[in-house]
């Protein structure tokens, strides 16, 4: 979703508030067009009165229009109650990075809007590929030793490596990868069909 598209839709619909649904999962392919699109959607949130139902933790691998409509619907409703109708008692978003600091060979990310605190969900055995046909795939973890799944680091060479360690510390997560002694960049859930658990 591009900023220009938001302005166009606001004009067409005569509505100031604008919320969209994040692209969830897509068939696991090698290119990174899907995570780039998610990043573009995130950047559009810098515009005033914009919101998003984050779905990186939901969806189905082989169906970009999954059967679960309750998850995006309830997340969009929470945003509308809080941001449009002024209901401060309704939380409308989950944890998001507030401060990122490199500490030797690790990176610490401090999160805002942590609610009752950060937690990592258990991995489970399977994930939905297409629920219409009762098709489930086996979970394969990229960081089996890490508490939090989905982080990757890169050094000066620009090569990404899945984190060997990603541990919750209070309202933050400390991330490290043995293959990256001096991390310069970090990302989370950067895949077409990521398995994430924070």
List the model feature ranges, each with a label:
Residues 11-20, 54-56, 111-113, 155, ...:
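Active-site proximal loops enriched in glycine and acidic residues that flank catalytic Cys/His/Asp
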Residues 83-140:
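Surface beta-strand/loop "capping" patches
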Residues 133-136, 141-156, 194-195:
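Solvent-exposed beta-hairpin/edge-strand motifs
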Residues 167-184:
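A surface-exposed beta-strand-loop module
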Residues 1-75, 82:
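Conserved, well-structured interaction surfaces
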Residues 148-172:
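Solvent-exposed beta-strand/loop surfaces of large extracellular or lumenal domains
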Residues 182, 190-198:
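Short acidic/polar inter-strand loop motif in beta-rich domains
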